[in-house]
Amino acid sequence: MGDDDEHNSSSTDEGRKEVDIYPLSCYYFGSKEAIVFKDETVSDRITRMKSNYAAYGLRTSVEAVLLVELFKHPHLLLLQLNNSIFKLPGGRLRPGETDIDGLRRKLSNKLSASRDGNEAEWEVGECLGMWWRHDFETLLCPYLPPTVKKPKCTKLFLVRLPESRKFIVPENLKLLAVPLSQVHENHKTYGTVISGVPQLLSKYSINIIDI
Amino acid sequence: MGDDDEHNSSSTDEGRKEVDIYPLSCYYFGSKEAIVFKDETVSDRITRMKSNYAAYGLRTSVEAVLLVELFKHPHLLLLQLNNSIFKLPGGRLRPGETDIDGLRRKLSNKLSASRDGNEAEWEVGECLGMWWRHDFETLLCPYLPPTVKKPKCTKLFLVRLPESRKFIVPENLKLLAVPLSQVHENHKTYGTVISGVPQLLSKYSINIIDI
């Protein structure tokens, strides 16, 4: 639809963005040594965030939206921790690190054979959306809350996968392909950020490539 | 945030998109003759949609996201019908009409002094998202549902407002400025499409311009 737009191409180009996705069977999945998590509990995490904040100020998180095809429907790749929490692959930036460098580092750390692998292999594309929150609160907003002086930000990036690759995942994490239709508005299971991903992708034409 | 990205500028540009918004007080609001609605009831509407479908096939709807500033927070302009239903300004395309031409026509029809006014005055920008549905069902999906052969599509476009203009609204409609924070995830009051707008805007840096 809308392919008959001829005027004003600079503004309609955006509406025609495409993403090619490949069958899940094109990818190889293996495991590697477990990742050591820094915090045992939520309160440990908050303590660590506070001390990091004191040392470095606010840090941005970057997360990746990775898609594959299964049963003719786009599926989102999610990491699952302890058979419960779902996360998009990603994490916090180091002080001074760019969004793209940080996301590549995190993706290699969590999804590649070697942490020091070829990070350029990750094709980090456009920012799809951002979520903001008060310093140490859990409530997320898709806009900068009016009363917040020092917000924390999570940015989502579209990462286009090649037609084949290996995913090597720490053995204490599971990498799952979940249908967009299951994720959409399913806040309870997937949380605010993940359950909103189908909407952020809605302007893209998703092409299923048969191999 | 993210302003320190220097590599790979083609893919980070998208993450830096900006929207300038102006105070509500910069705009003039007036009224004009009521719009005649084609349907009295939902069942009238479905009957009309079916007969249109038989005559023209499926038609795309286009809707505008228009922002103003009030109390230092971005507000979304919504039309309200009968003190109840909220709608983004827009409507269905005519057969063969482009997204941009159709949206400009609808915006002039609902928000300008004259229907035949200068439609180019509306700066229709990028597509923010799309919603799909089965032919005559009301359930909306932000992805093409796998089983649907002939989906209907609603496309949302960002329309940047100039620093001043007149809005002349049919007297049976109200034009309201609603804070993004009130719209966000408020499905009950605003419906699926409108309540998702803050998330679709989240990748933009919204600049409040003081006049």
Feature roles, as predicted:
Chain A
Residues 1-211:
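N-terminal leader/linker segments that precede catalytic domains of diphosphate-processing enzymes
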